[in-house]
């Protein structure tokens, strides 16, 4: 009877150990893949990231938004002229320099609107150069491997009782689902930022048309700050990955399999949290809202 009981226990142990090893073997693959893509994704300009989307957005900006920007420009510069006249005591203290000043500001406004796309892309080219320079300094190769953290994994599992094995099997199953969810979160942050960039750049001529007006100029200035925040968010993301790489690189070899699994997951949750915070942090630095 004891022989049969032991045979059943050994059979269940082999099944649980096989299931745990199977769960652990690909536990961090999806997350490692997403993390490895981050440096390349955030270091790419809108033109290089997806040429078809870029061309579509530029076409919309030039053919749909630019005429609207022309109307906005005419309105704000007319408003500027009226304000200049009112400030000069309703033409009683008028001088010719006032009109030269208005003509100069209008010419600058037209120059800004007609070169909006070059200005916007210049911001992201600047951000790309910063990210590429930082990528050469920071550690961005971050890969989790449970076998490097827990030595002699299979032999340790075979020495465990059925109860702890069943609990560990359930933990690996749960952590596996969580790691898939975290990899999706990383995907959302990285790709969502690029979609946001395309959305913001598509309407660029309208806020840029307000730049030279005293009252409406804050719209254009805040738009530029938003562009800088989006551009330098890539730098923040790269720093997050570098910190994550340093943290997992310092994970010590552990005898506790459960502790090792949850530690790796904890660092990945921390990475996702900081990636989501990178947008608000960049906007607060540049006072964009």
Each language-model region and where it sits:
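Alpha-helical transmembrane segments
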Residues: 208-225, 252-253, 284-287
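Binding/recognition "hotspot" determinant
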Residues: 1-72
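Alpha-helical transmembrane segments and their helix-start/interface "positive-inside/aromatic belt" motifs
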Residues: 1, 5-8, 12-23, 94-112, ...
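Long, low-complexity, intrinsically disordered extramembrane tails
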Residues: 1-3, 283-289
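Non-cytosolic segments of integral membrane proteins
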Residues: 16, 20, 24, 106-203, ...
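Hydrophobic, aromatic-rich alpha-helical transmembrane segments
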Residues: 60-64, 95-99, 103, 165, ...
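Hydrophobic transmembrane alpha-helix segments characteristic of membrane transport
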Residues: 72-108, 203-217
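Internal transmembrane helix-loop-helix hairpins in multi-pass membrane proteins, together
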Residues: 35-65, 85, 89, 109, ...
